[in-house]
């Protein structure tokens, strides 16, 4: 049985609630402001916290996911896939209870396979499910089981992650994926807004999130949305989880950025 102290309502995971949580943590720590860092889905959270709570945020760093501004058009709400359509994990997440049940039943398999699939150079066995159609099954068996864990992931760390997810379950995290359209509806005031604070973006060169974009391409994408972007850094040979695959380099970049602040 999962033990959780996070909200159950899907809409409680919208971007405004999450940004308010970050601002609330700063207040709870009895600090006036802070520099914040977020990776993957944490990056949109810190970007939006900087926009929505400028008085609380001195500077901001995003890893993997670059801020691209508020879209002109409302995102379509993903719908459950037709069973004959090609499997897509975000669509799989839209049907409440389905993905959670699969992941909660075997968190170790999910985490080990997912981390290996995002770690260049880690060998994996062929996936059990090779049929691309949604009807063929869920996500875990579409990911190859790693021959061994990625070099940056120890058995001890994996066991810790698994034990924590056994307590919390995956529903909260998956609910994040169910709020794309609501996030847009809740943030009309951000139309055309730029992040004013000093900012840094770091990504692995091989991170699939950025689809092979070069540093110049990422800088061009970022330019309209930042007032003081102090760097776009691609870490050579690194994949999605750059803070774990390249901790020393990531820490160096963060320390240099902090040193550049007034």
Predicted regions and their residues:
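Flexible "cap/lid" subdomain of the alpha/beta-hydrolase fold that forms the substrate-access gate
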Residues: 5-37, 41-233
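Short, small-residue-biased leader/transition segments that mark boundaries at the very start
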Residues: 1-3
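Catalytic active-site module of serine/aspartate enzymes centered on a nucleophile-bearing elbow/loop
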Residues: 227-262
């Amino acid at each position: 049985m999962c033990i959780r102290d996070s909200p159950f309502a899907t809409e409680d995971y919208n971007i405004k609630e999450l940004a308010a949580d970050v601002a609330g943590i700063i207040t709870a720590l009895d600090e006036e402001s802070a520099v914040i860092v977020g990776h993957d889905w944490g990056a949109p959270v810190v970007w939006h916290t900087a926009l929505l709570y400028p008085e609380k945020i001195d500077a901001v760093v995003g890893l993997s996911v670059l801020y691209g501004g508020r879209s002109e058009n409302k995102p379509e709400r993903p719908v459950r896939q037709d069973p004959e359509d090609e499997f897509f994990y975000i669509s799989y997440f839209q049907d409440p209870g389905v993905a959670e049940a699969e992941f909660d039943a075997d968190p170790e398999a999910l985490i080990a396979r997912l981390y290996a699939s995002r770690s260049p150079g880690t060998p994996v066995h062929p996936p059990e499910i090779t049929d691309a159609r949604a009807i063929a099954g869920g996500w875990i068996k579409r990911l190859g089981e790693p021959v061994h864990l990625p070099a940056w992931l120890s058995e001890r760390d994996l066991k810790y992650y698994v034990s924590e997810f056994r307590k919390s379950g995956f529903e909260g995290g998956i609910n994040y994926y169910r709020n794309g359209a609501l996030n847009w509806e809740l943030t009309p005031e951000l139309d055309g807004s730029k992040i004013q604070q000093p900012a840094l973006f770091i990504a692995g060169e091989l991170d699939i999130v950025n689809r092979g974009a070069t540093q110049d391409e990422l800088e061009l994408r970022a330019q309209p949305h930042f007032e003081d972007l102090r760097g776009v850094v691609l870490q050579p040979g690194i994949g999605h989880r750059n803070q774990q695959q390249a901790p020393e380099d990531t820490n160096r970049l963060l320390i240099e950025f902090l040193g550049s602040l007034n």
